[in-house]
Amino acid sequence: MTVAAPERAGGPWLYAGGPYPTAPAPVRPAAVLFDRDGTLVADVPYNGDPARVAPMPGARAALDALRGRGIPVGVVSNQSGVARGLLTRGQVEAVQRRVEELLGPFAVWAVCPHGPADGCGCRKPAPGLVLAACRRLGVAPEDTAVVGDIGADLGAARAAGARGVLVPTPVTRPEEIAAAPCRAADLPDAVRQLLGRPSSAEPVR
């Protein structure tokens, strides 16, 4: 995982992985971007401790199913703990490294370090993280899927023109679940749907 040059001052932090596979043009989605906390790993508020990183059930299998089909995977994550003075960039990056140790490499990380009052264009549900990740991967937002556990994740997908898939957890609000255009029981189910298989069909391998 290497730090990529910022697109502009005050924008998101970008981290480029790779080399990463590129899906053939007819394959949809061309890339899948995941929220981090509550989606790929258990949500530990403002976590700066790699030892507290715990993958969500089925996360590795779901990611490997996409990687095995040549579909790049990335992460789009709000980390307002930086703006609040609760996290350093070094802590954020240490947690990212631990996530990759447990779940494998990601083609791109797009991280918003700003707070809710900062007025940035990257904090979800704004589209900036999704758009920046798509540019880094060289894919069109409309050919990209975003998987997350709350309405802000799907809001960012919608604002960017991407497809959103909600994987609810106990903290997901009922109104967010009701409003989601696409829902999945868990990460393997989300991947099955994105690959065009029946929901809860054969196991993701």
Predicted regions, residues:
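Substrate-recognition element of Asp-dependent hydrolases with the DxDx(T/V) motif
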Residues: 59, 63-96, 105-118, 157
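Short glycine- and Lys/Arg-enriched binding-loop motifs that mark or flank ligand-binding interfaces
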Residues: 34, 73, 81, 144, ...
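Proline-centered helix-kink/hinge sites
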Residues: 50, 57, 113, 125-127
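A short acidic, helix-capping loop that chelates divalent metal ions and anchors anionic groups
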Residues: 44, 49, 81-86, 115-120, ...
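Asp-based, Mg2+/Mn2+-dependent phosphohydrolase catalytic module
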Residues: 1-25, 30, 90-108, 117-146, ...
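A short alpha-helix capping/helix-coil boundary motif
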Residues: 40-43, 76-78, 108-110, 131-134
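Short glycine-rich anion-binding loops that position phosphate/pyrophosphate groups of nucleotides
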Residues: 39, 80, 151
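Active-site neighborhood of HAD-like aspartate-dependent phosphohydrolases
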Residues: 3-74
